From Swiss-Prot:
Protein name, per record: SIFamide related peptide
Subcellular localization, as worded in the UniProt entry: Secreted
Keywords: Amidation, Neuropeptide, Secreted
A Gene Ontology term for the protein's cellular component: extracellular region
Amino acid sequence: TYKKPPFNGSIF
């Protein structure tokens, strides 16, 4: 899941 920092989960 791409979220704002801090990244929670995998960055795709």
